[in-house]
Amino acid sequence: KLNNPILIGHSQGCLQILEYAYKYKNKINKAVFIGGSNKMPVHPDLIELAQNGDSEAVKLMMKWGYEGSKKFIGGNPVEKIIKSPRDISEILALDLIACNNYVNGHDAAKSINCPVLFVFGELDKMVNIEAGKKFANLVKDSKTHIIKGCGHMIMIEKAFEMREKVLEFLK
């Protein structure tokens, strides 16, 4: 049994927090949404690429998630995690479909009644700043922090700044 948890999610994980908050009102102590939105539509072509196990799906996501923000020594870490056609078709495709099909985000966000921190990457093309601000405005008790020079993969690109802001909020 969880008693007043603090929930922290990134991207699709934000949708999971939203649904938890909606189903278990008054049970959350605080929440942190990192690079998320109350709705996360996914282009049908990207879903199709992922369903077919095409590595182009991962390349496109990484382009949108990182482009213009940071280059990694040794290559992009996400491409090392999701690398086989099976990973793409059985894991990534299902995640993209779940994001695309989630429709309760607006009502769920409006129902949140605990303090919330929103963290967005200034250069994020997957959840742009405007979508993020609209999301944050749905929540009564919220603070927003935008990390400059950062894309969608905030916890990898700007880990220290993100951690500092989250810890500051949790105190």
Kindly give the residue locations of the regions a language model identified:
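Alpha/beta-hydrolase fold nucleophile elbow
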Residues: 2-11
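Flexible "cap/lid" loop of the alpha/beta hydrolase fold
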Residues: 15-59
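Conserved alpha/beta-hydrolase catalytic His-Asp/Glu region
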Residues: 48-111
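Residue-level signal for the nucleotide or nucleotide-sugar donor/cofactor binding architecture
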Residues: 87, 127-130, 157
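Hydrophobic "lid"/C-terminal helical patch
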Residues: 96, 135, 162, 166, ...
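Short beta-strand/loop motif that positions the catalytic acidic residue
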Residues: 112, 118-120, 124
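Catalytic histidine neighborhood in serine/cysteine hydrolases
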Residues: 129, 133-152
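Catalytic histidine-centered segment of alpha/beta-hydrolase-like enzymes
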Residues: 150-163
